[in-house]
């Protein structure tokens, strides 16, 4: 799998190393309509409906699911990103799934599932 960014890679490794997570699935790799996990959203800039593929889907050990998106700090407030987030939140709520959008800086500073600071020795190259 080719990660889009270091924070996305760090997020993935935090999820697979966590004892709270049973499995993690890549969803973004199915961007050529090969997978079923996508979110339709209204793009306020183009006025069109598009498909959005979140980064990961995690099955937690408590039986719940999390749909996960990692965004750079400079993009997280973008109107299109927010439109994707709103559509994903609506779809996730209707499906009983929790949607998480993480800022890259948050992932690099915090063990997101543990709410603990990341130690410099644990950062990925």
Predicted regions and their residues:
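Electrostatic, structured charged patches in enzyme active sites and in nucleic-acid/phosphate-binding
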Residues: 1-125
